[in-house]
Amino acid sequence: NHIGNGMSIRRARFAVKAQLDRNWYGEIDTDWADGICELKDAILAYNGVPGLEIKAGNFKESFSIQRNTTSRYLMFMERPMVTSLAPSRHLGLNLTYSNKWFWFAGGVFGPELKGAEEATAMKDNNKDLGRNAGLSYTGKVVFRPLYKCSESALHLGGAISYREPKVTSTDAYGAARYSSRNSTSINRKKYLDTDVITGLDHELAWTAELAGFYKGLRYEGAYLTRGAFLDKKINNLGTQWADGWYAQASYLLFGGRQNYDYDGAKPTRITPGRSWGDVELAVRYEYCDFNTADYFGGSAETFSFGINFYPTKNVKFVINYQYNNNDRYANGKGKLFVGHDAAGNPTKDYTKVVEGAGKAGVDYHMLAMRFQVAF
């Protein structure tokens, strides 16, 4: 399986954000990285009561701390593999309440509208088949017991989401699919992929997370799982669960300080320790398992090491090294070689692989670099 190197403009964002008056806020955010416009956020929010925000539009559901942390302030170039199980942006209505020690968000969400393909699928399902858009109900709570400490923060969070089938699914209506790349946007191969799980009645996802900082040290870990509950009239199999977890930490070497956004319940921009900036060392381990009860989508683990250089508050240089270890079931829906058969020939069929436990599957090293402007 040849893995090509590559370059890309990972994100090219253009946004307009405005506090319209003391009570109302509006935002529209787009991405032009692929040469076409992709809608990100389109928000109207009421924030006239301290600690309370009510917003409507297209935005990220409050579920995963990794998903909700803006890409500008990620510890590594890409989010962990298991984040693919977390819901992202959907049309919806959400309420958030926060104070220093407690944070809560709850919302009702509909379809995902990130491009023309999803919009067309929604319109066709409505016009031709009269299908409902599909709703999701997502809630999250966070406790912050160290809110009185000026040099540290502790984030203890949990979230749950009940999800109906969406008419914007580009796989099939009434289907689930769990897939992920190996925490990279350059290697486009999706080693982990259950393919389409038909007969979906609803999904249930939940997560538990711990995060925080102490002076220049930042740490974060989470467990996520998502299950497809099937309609027995269509698919008589049991619930199909996929899950994974990660743990990561970083440290600013020259006296800088990590920071935490209490209103958003997530990490935010660092404070450099020197006039010329600061350097951050980071390490992460992650594991993701898409081998459900009846669909073998593969599992993988990744070891990552990173160096982040912040010459100013709006510029970031990143170098990441990553080792990826995929199992024999991580064959990209049967498209990738994962071992050898009894005759010694490469095979894509995991049932024919003769290598012992831990020997089959695609393993590889990766080195990546990013130059980033963070407005």
Walk through the language-model features, giving the residues of each.
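Outer-membrane beta-barrel pore domains
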Residues: 170-375
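Outer membrane beta-barrel
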Residues: 1-124, 128-166, 241, 246-273, ...
